């Protein structure tokens, strides 16, 4: 009987805090790697198992001379210093080896400490090892008490669904003791749910020589498991435990018993799984070679030509071989892992890495037992040394995975006579890794796409480890990377009739026999082959997205699984959105042309191209289509293929792609036909498609500015700093800006920074310099009017210029203004230059933002999904009532840029929807206190600079804002420029993390459910009304609606929209909210949707703020006198102050509960009049008709004045 071996680790005991890395169950062991053995031959083994690197010469240090007073002080201090070096003990041999390991293997001591701490937290507690040992002893005694006999009907259902059932099974008690297998045996159990696998071998007496045929072995195995389970339930030792059946690896032929102990101290995190196996000598060795058939067509009542060879059942054969060879394979693993802490820890690291990427799930999963076997293989090949550290083990495995090809086969079996047979066996599988017996392919069920994905992830891990500028630990081990966040599109088919139709009409008989009629792998093969052929280079990978099968009570019937399928498509951004699929020439290759025409059906047409060739081709769109339309080309192709080849209806297919692009589309309420412009605008256009129009207009304006004659100073550079220039403006920018009564009206202004040539004539006084700048701008405006016929208007912020319906705000930047802002004169008359908030804001806007804006524009050019991802993210934050004053827009842009810059996925993000889901994961799981988000644009930051900044961040964390963002252009302000302590605050960050987790829960639930469709945008992009104390409704006719798609308010129903053009650069509501926060942020928090929100939500501070306090002259703001000479802040008084500040915007105030009640009672809140509901109810119908008739004949001017006067009257 196997026992769990207690592992004594050096260092302090594991703490009780929750583990930092995800833990998981598994069936295997540990691992390690040579930091310098990336596919190279292993060098001569040293004492630590890796070649000593050649030491690099140290650069000579520059000597600096201290100023004379300082040097004298230093000498005086040294005079009294004692020489402690003589009292320091030299380092021990173990300490020297540890220091050398840190220098040679790890990036830094931090990475080593993180790995060490994680391994300590993964250590199995003693209470679990003791319980498992005691349970195994008890179970061994139990199996010896079992009695032989005929298995009759019991209360339990046999956990197997087969067409033809056997009868008369005679049970024989085990002749061999139960054994621990997998991770429990090799000492690599992983939590948080610790799963202990136990194998009980069925004796040969239960089986006959012909039981290998037609699923008889599988039925006897299931009957044996059922009998043992029934006996355990009636035994007092297990009667209180919880019993359930489940399918191991989503394989319906592999039922296992899942037992949850009743003992309270282990029941929460411990589960035992019972496997039934058979002796390897039960059947002849050649029965289960891949080319043999062990399920006859007659079993399924199919006819088969006797002269034709029977189809091979290689996958079914591998399923049986798994049981037969389990003991031999486990013995090999135990020999390799037991007593080797380095191998065990290495495998634990690999398990965490694999589980975080969800590549080990389901029928097609790349299980951790494969990784354990691969460690043994590398040890056999002398690529891994027995003394390799755990880090070396993991790194070597990643490196070998990335650089070896298993499609031709590798084997653990002795080399003699295996080469020819190995190549033959490999031809029956996508991936081939033979076990020690040389009969079982450990990767029999792993499809090529999953294997290639594992290789890509392994290569990424090695690249991250090689990047000396990066702390790769969180990216490799800590970040959870669900598979749905790694794919761009998802195909989901859950309709039962569609599944059966595909299996009946399109599954070949050979596939049915090979997988024993299990539908899931057949569907996977049918769909993958079809989509690979149709999409070709448009996709980089097609991956199955599986959910682990759920356990069921032992009294219930075994469920039928595999009746739904979900595939993830990883797109190639370079080819995915091509509008043309060109076939072979009809003259040169008539057969190929006919095949192309047959494959594509009616979509294929004969076309002549500009080069004169005439070929068959399929056109999916035009080159002028908007990017959002082009992102649906792959969806269009997949839907056509499924309909044309598999006869599936579109209503039975869920293709998840670009559902969230809706949020930045133009509102259907706004009619583009009313916009007077020469541009071709479509009603279904969006913010992304409209951005190039603004950029082209800006480019023309920049050329005109450079071409202006007779300017006093030359224009050196012109930079746009508006979000639209970076494709990051979520509101559609239409050419509707107009000049009205000498004022420019526009919903958006595009900010432009102009740098002038050097001159020594600028004044040395700040106000004079700014006056001269204004005069210069006026001259630029006059010349634009005279030479380019452009209208302009001067404001306090700069020069407004109207061009082609777009409004630009020109600002002049001059270094002298920045210097004057920093200038301070001390009491002694000494002039010094000190940073202050105003100077930092000016430096950011005039000098840093233009560079960052250009870098983000370049990022969008290389990753076309970057801009749309920002648009979705900004819309989501706005709908959660987080405006620019709470969450800076640049923080969103830089966080998304961080996602696209960091290499935490093998492939770049091709779909904005996927980018948004990754951003949600970042927001949901980031450690805001410990993470500094670095954006090294153009790799202009050196390794030393990054290290210094990270050291400063860790050592002086309190001087940085809660959300620390740093770009390589920030200079001395790195980490403190884009956010502040209050924008966003730590409380807001926690709030956003909760919102992101909730959004991810909705997304995951919809993806994992067979019945639910993917979440609708209205579910994600509508904030909650919970948690707010008051809601101030604003007059909808004074607050213009946003031009983007309106997904509704969390408080009230839809209202008639208005699209009034405000004065350019004016946002009165944002200004009022800023005033409210400035005056009353100590007493209340204010929230509103900056994208056309009509409500202002208020949340009071804690009650202690409103408690009576002693009278103090300095603390009387918003206070009212109360008893005993004390003062207190009264909420009702604050509300009256809010009304005064809101002035004409205020309509009514209520609580969220009142608004909900009105919605339920269908009493829609009055938006234009602050009238009580009963006022309208008291009116008779005839009176209402008379009022309506009178309103129709009223003059429009009179009606307008009435609408304005009523709310003002109610305020008084």
Swiss-Prot record:
Pfam families given in the database record: Nrap (PF03813), Nrap_D2 (PF17403), Nrap_D3 (PF17404), Nrap_D4 (PF17405), Nrap_D5 (PF17406), Nrap_D6 (PF17407)
Keyword Nucleus on entry: yes
Keyword Nucleus annotated: yes
Region feature Disordered, mapped onto this chain: 1-72, 1156-1212
Any one cellular-component term (Gene Ontology): small-subunit processome
Alphabetized UniProt keyword annotations: Chromosome, Nucleus, RNA-binding
Biased amino acid composition, Basic residues: 1197-1212
Superkingdom assignment: Eukaryota
GO biological process terms held by the UniProt record: ribosomal small subunit biogenesis; rRNA processing; tRNA export from nucleus
Subcellular location: Nucleus, Nucleolus; Chromosome
GO molecular function: RNA binding
Signal peptide annotation: none
InterPro entries, per database record: NOL6/Upt22, Nrap_D1, Nrap_D2, Nrap_D3, Nrap_D4, Nrap_D5, Nrap_D6
PANTHER family, A to Z: NUCLEOLAR PROTEIN 6, NUCLEOLAR RNA-ASSOCIATED PROTEIN
Function recorded in the entry: Part of the small subunit (SSU) processome, first precursor of the small eukaryotic ribosomal subunit. During the assembly of the SSU processome in the nucleolus, many ribosome biogenesis factors, an RNA chaperone and ribosomal proteins associate with the nascent pre-rRNA and work in concert to generate RNA folding, modifications, rearrangements and cleavage as well as targeted degradation of pre-ribosomal RNA by the RNA exosome.
Family of the protein in this entry: Belongs to the NRAP family.
Quaternary state and interactors: Part of the small subunit (SSU) processome, composed of more than 70 proteins and the RNA chaperone small nucleolar RNA (snoRNA) U3.
Protein name per Swiss-Prot or TrEMBL: Nucleolar protein 6
Organism: Drosophila persimilis
């Amino acid at each position: 009987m196997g026992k769990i071996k207690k592992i004594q680790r050096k260092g302090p005991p594991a703490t009780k805090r929750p583990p930092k890395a995800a833990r998981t169950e598994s069936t295997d062991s540990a691992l390690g790697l040579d930091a310098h053995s990336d596919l190279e031959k292993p060098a001569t083994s040293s004492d630590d198992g890796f070649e000593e690197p050649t030491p690099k010469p140290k650069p000579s240090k520059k000597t600096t001379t201290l100023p004379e007073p300082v040097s004298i002080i230093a000498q005086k201090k040294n005079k009294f210093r004692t020489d402690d070096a003589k009292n320091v003990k030299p380092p021990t041999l173990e300490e020297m080896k540890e220091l050398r390991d840190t220098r040679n293997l790890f990036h830094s001591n931090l990475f080593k400490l993180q790995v060490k701490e994680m391994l300590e937290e993964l250590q199995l507690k003693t209470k679990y090892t003791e319980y498992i040992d005691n349970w195994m002893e008890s179970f061994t005694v139990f199996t010896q008490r079992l009695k032989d006999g005929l298995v009759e009907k019991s209360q339990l259902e046999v956990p197997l669904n087969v067409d033809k059932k056997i009868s008369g099974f005679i049970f024989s008690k085990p002749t061999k003791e139960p054994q621990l297998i997998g991770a429990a045996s090799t000492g690599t159990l992983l939590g948080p749910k610790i799963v202990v696998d136990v194998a009980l071998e069925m004796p040969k007496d239960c089986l006959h020589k012909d039981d290998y045929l037609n699923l008889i072995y599988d039925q006897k195995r299931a009957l044996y498991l059922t009998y043992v389970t029934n006996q355990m339930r009636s035994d007092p030792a297990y009667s209180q435990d919880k019993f359930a059946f489940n399918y191991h690896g989503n394989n319906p032929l592999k039922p296992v018993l899942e037992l949850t102990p009743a003992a309270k101290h282990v029941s929460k995190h411990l589960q035992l799984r019972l496997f039934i196996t058979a002796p390897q000598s039960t059947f002849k060795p050649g029965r289960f070679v891949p080319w043999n058939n062990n399920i006859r067509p007659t079993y399924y009542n199919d006819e088969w030509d006797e002269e034709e060879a029977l189809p091979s059942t290689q996958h079914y054969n591998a399923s049986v071989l798994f049981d037969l060879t389990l003991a031999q394979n486990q013995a090999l693993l135990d020999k390799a892992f037991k007593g080797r802490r380095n191998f065990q820890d290495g495998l634990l690291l690999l398990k965490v890495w694999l589980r975080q990427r969800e590549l080990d799930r389901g029928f097609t999963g790349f299980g951790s037992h494969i990784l354990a076997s691969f460690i043994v293989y590398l040890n056999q090949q002398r690529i891994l040394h027995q003394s390799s550290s755990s880090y070396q083990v993991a790194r070597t495995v990643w490196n070998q995975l990335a650089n070896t090809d298993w499609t031709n086969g590798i084997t653990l079996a002795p080399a003699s006579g295996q080469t020819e047979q190995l190549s033959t066996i490999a031809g029956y599988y996508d991936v081939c890794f033979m076990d020690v017996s040389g009969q079982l392919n450990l990767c029999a069920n792993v499809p090529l796409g999953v294997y290639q994905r594992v290789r890509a992830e392994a290569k990424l891990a090695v690249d991250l480890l090689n990047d000396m500028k990066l702390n790769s630990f969180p990216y490799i081990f800590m970040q959870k990377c669900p598979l749905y966040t790694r794919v761009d599109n998802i195909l989901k088919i859950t309709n039962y009739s569609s599944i059966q139709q595909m299996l009946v009409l399109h599954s070949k008989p050979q596939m049915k026999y090979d997988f024993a009629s299990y539908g899931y792998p057949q569907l996977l093969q049918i769909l993958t082959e079809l989509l690979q052929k149709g999409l070709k280079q448009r996709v980089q990978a097609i991956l199955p997205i599986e959910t682990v099968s759920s356990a069921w009570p032992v009294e219930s019937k075994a469920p039928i699984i595999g009746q739904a399928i979900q595939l993830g498509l990883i797109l190639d951004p370079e080819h995915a959105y091509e509008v043309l699929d060109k076939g072979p020439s009809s003259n040169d290759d008539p057969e190929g042309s006919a095949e192309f025409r047959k494959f594509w059906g009616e979509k294929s047409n004969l076309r002549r191209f500009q080069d004169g060739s005439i070929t068959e081709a399929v056109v999916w769109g035009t080159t002028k289509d908007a990017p959002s339309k082009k992102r649906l080309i792959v969806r269009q192709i997949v839907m056509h293929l499924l309909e044309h080849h598999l006869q599936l209806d579109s209503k039975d297919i869920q293709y998840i792609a670009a559902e969230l692009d809706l949020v930045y589309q133009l509102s259907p309420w706004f009619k583009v036909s009313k916009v007077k412009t020469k541009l071709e605008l479509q009603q279904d256009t969006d913010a992304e498609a409209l951005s190039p129009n603004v950029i082209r207009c800006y480019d023309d304006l920049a050329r005109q500015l450079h071409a202006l004659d007779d300017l006093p100073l030359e224009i050196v550079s012109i930079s746009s700093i508006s979000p639209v220039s970076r494709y990051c403006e979520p509101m559609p920018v239409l050419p509707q800006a107009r000049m009205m009564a000498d004022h420019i009206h526009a919903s958006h202004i595009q900010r432009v920074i102009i740098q002038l040539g050097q001159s020594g004539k600028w004044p040395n006084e700040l106000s004079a310099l700014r006056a001269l700048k204004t005069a210069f701008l006026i001259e630029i405006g006059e010349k634009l009017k005279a030479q380019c016929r452009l209208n302009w208007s001067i404001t306090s912020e700069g020069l407004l210029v109207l061009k082609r319906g777009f409004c630009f705000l020109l600002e002049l930047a001059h270094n002298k203004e920045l210097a004057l802002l920093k200038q301070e004169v001390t009491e002694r008359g000494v002039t010094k230059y000190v940073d202050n908030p105003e100077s930092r804001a000016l430096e950011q806007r005039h000098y840093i933002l233009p560079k960052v804006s250009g870098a983000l524009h370049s990022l969008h050019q290389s990753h076309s999904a970057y801009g749309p991802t920002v648009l979705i993210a900004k819309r989501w934050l706005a709908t959660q009532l987080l405006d620019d004053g709470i969450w800076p827009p640049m923080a969103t842009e830089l966080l998304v840029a961080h996602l696209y810059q960091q290499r935490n996925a093998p492939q770049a993000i091709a779909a904005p929807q996927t980018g948004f889901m990754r951003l949600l994961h970042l927001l949901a799981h980031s450690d805001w206190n410990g993470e500094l988000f670095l954006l090294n644009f153009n790799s202009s930051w050196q390794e030393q600079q990054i290290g210094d900044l990270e050291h400063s961040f860790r050592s002086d964390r309190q001087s940085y804002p809660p959300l620390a963002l740093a770009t390589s252009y920030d200079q001395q302000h790195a980490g403190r420029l884009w956010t502040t302590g209050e924008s966003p605050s730590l409380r807001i960050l926690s709030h956003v993390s909760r919102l992101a987790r909730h959004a991810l829960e909705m997304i995951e639930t919809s993806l994992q459910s067979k019945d639910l469709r993917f979440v609708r945008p209205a579910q994600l992009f509508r904030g909650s009304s919970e948690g707010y104390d008051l809601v101030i409704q604003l007059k909808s006719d004074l607050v213009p609606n946003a031009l983007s798609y309106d997904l509704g308010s969390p408080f009230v129903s839809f209202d008639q929209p208005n699209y009034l053009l405000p004065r350019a650069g004016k946002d009165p509501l944002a200004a009022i909210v800023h005033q409210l926060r400035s005056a009353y942020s100590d007493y209340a928090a204010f929230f509103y949707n900056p994208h056309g929100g009509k409500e202002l939500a208020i949340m009071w501070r804690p009650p202690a703020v409103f408690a009576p306090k002693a009278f103090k002259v300095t603390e009387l703001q918003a206070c009212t006198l109360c008893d005993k000479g004390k003062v207190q802040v009264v909420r009702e008084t604050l509300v009256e102050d809010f009304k005064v500040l809101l002035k004409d915007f205020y309509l009514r105030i209520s609580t969220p509960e009142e608004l909900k009640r009105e919605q339920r009672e269908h009493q829609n809140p009055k938006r234009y009049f602050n009238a009580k509901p009963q006022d309208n109810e008291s009116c008779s119908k005839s009176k209402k008709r008379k009022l309506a008739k009178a309103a129709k004949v009223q003059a429009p001017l009179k009606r307008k004045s009435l609408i304005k006067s009523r709310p003002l009257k109610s305020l008084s």
